[in-house]
């Protein structure tokens, strides 16, 4: 087994390598003078079981091309098997054509890219839409960050907690967490826009008065909706508001939104490196997925069961 990484998440890749007691593979991943991606594998990989650790987060296109070019370099160097470990899978939100709009299904395009260049297997975490697995012509292991989040939740001292889904689409995830979190009550934020150019209205389904609210989501992008949800929960009498999410995208004006929000703490995983400005926020806490990903990689390499790691799915 050998691990390689591009420039997207070198810190997480190093932590995974440390957990597996191996060193990262020697590869030069940089740029030519005109900005094109330059890759060279600096060690023998012939017949090897290779894992490339690379999130396709921002800069999304650069990181994606790095991954694709690394796969090609390793394939041409006669690696026996190549697994792309993509903790955060970019373009996952472009997974369908809404009302037959003239738009691409970009997640399918990316899947085709990876399959055609020679990836044998995909390992990812909390795909935004699980059906994306069907876009690939190779096996996909979509593992869950929720056990790590749940473990942290169980260690906290919440006051009369209630798990909150920030939208209807996240109900199944929130319900599963609530059940495992001591069968805690659940609330749902129902978001609706009465008509165009009218501000979105948020209604709370459930009683959050005098309770600590735990918002559960798969990702935080600009944080606008999440911060507005926290405001509504506080208006309804919530004591404190905590947000747990796997992927910290934090794009656009996320810093400003979080800085002025009423969220007491945001707990996220290390699938995407945080910008230095975001790291200065006092209410951000990071959990690492390195142990879980290292064990998953070990199991893939040894042809062991992945599903046995999870006694539930969220």
Swiss-Prot record:
One of its GO terms (cellular component) is ribose phosphate diphosphokinase complex. Mg(2+) 1 binds at residue 128. The keyword Calcium does not apply. ATP binds at residues 34-36, 93-94. One of its GO terms (biological process) is 5-phosphoribose 1-diphosphate biosynthetic process. It comes from the Bacteria. PROSITE patterns: PRPP_SYNTHASE (PS00114). Pfam families: Pribosyl_synth (PF14572), Pribosyltran_N (PF13793). Mg(2+) 2 binds at residue 167. The active site is at 191. It is found in: Cytoplasm. Keywords: ATP-binding, Cytoplasm, Kinase, Magnesium, Metal-binding, Nucleotide biosynthesis, Nucleotide-binding, Transferase. The keyword Cytoplasm applies. Its EC number is 2.7.6.1. It catalyses: D-ribose 5-phosphate + ATP = 5-phospho-alpha-D-ribose 1-diphosphate + AMP + H(+). Binds 2 Mg(2+) ions per subunit. Pathway: Metabolic intermediate biosynthesis; 5-phospho-alpha-D-ribose 1-diphosphate biosynthesis; 5-phospho-alpha-D-ribose 1-diphosphate from D-ribose 5-phosphate (route I): step 1/1. Its cofactor is Mg(2+). GO terms for molecular function: ATP binding; kinase activity; magnesium ion binding; ribose phosphate diphosphokinase activity. Involved in the biosynthesis of the central metabolite phospho-alpha-D-ribosyl-1-pyrophosphate (PRPP) via the transfer of pyrophosphoryl group from ATP to 1-hydroxyl of ribose-5-phosphate (Rib-5-P). Homohexamer. Belongs to the ribose-phosphate pyrophosphokinase family. Class I subfamily. This is Ribose-phosphate pyrophosphokinase. It comes from Blochmanniella floridana. The gene is prs.
């Amino acid at each position: 087994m050998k691990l390689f990484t591009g420039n997207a998440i070198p810190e997480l890749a190093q932590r995974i390598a440390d957990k597996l007691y191996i060193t990262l593979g020697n590869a030069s991943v940089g740029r030519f003078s005109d900005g094109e991606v330059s890759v060279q594998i600096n060690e023998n990989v012939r017949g090897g079981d290779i894992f490339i650790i690379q999130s396709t987060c921002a800069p999304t296109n650069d990181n994606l091309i790095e991954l694709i070019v690394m796969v090609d370099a390793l394939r041409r160097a006669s690696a026996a098997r190549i697994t792309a470990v993509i903790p955060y899978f970019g373009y996952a939100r472009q997974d369908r054509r809404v009302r037959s709009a003239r738009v691409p299904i970009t997640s399918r395009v990316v899947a085709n890219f990876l399959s055609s260049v020679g990836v044998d297997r995909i390992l990812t975490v909390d795909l935004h839409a699980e059906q994306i697995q069907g876009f690939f012509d190779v096996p996909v292991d979509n593992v869950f960050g929720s056990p790590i989040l749940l473990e942290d939740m169980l260690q906290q001292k919440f006051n009369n907690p209630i798990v909150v889904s920030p939208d209807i689409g996240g109900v199944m995830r929130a319900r599963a967490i609530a059940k495992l979190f001591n069968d805690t009550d659940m609330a749902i934020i129902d978001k609706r826009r009465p008509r165009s150019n009218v501000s979105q209205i948020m209604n709370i389904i459930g009683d959050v008065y005098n309770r600590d609210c735990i918002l559960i989501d798969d990702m935080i992008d600009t944080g606008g909706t999440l911060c507005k949800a926290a405001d509504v929960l506080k208006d309804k009498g919530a004591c404190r508001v905590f947000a747990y999410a796997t992927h910290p995208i934090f794009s656009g004006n996320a810093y400003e939104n979080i800085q002025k929000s009423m969220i007491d703490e945001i707990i996220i995983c290390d699938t995407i490196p945080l910008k230095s400005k975001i790291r200065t926020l006092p209410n951000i806490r990071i959990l690492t997925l390195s142990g879980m990903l290292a064990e998953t990689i070990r199991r893939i390499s040894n042809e062991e069961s992945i599903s046995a790691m999870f006694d539930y799915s969220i």
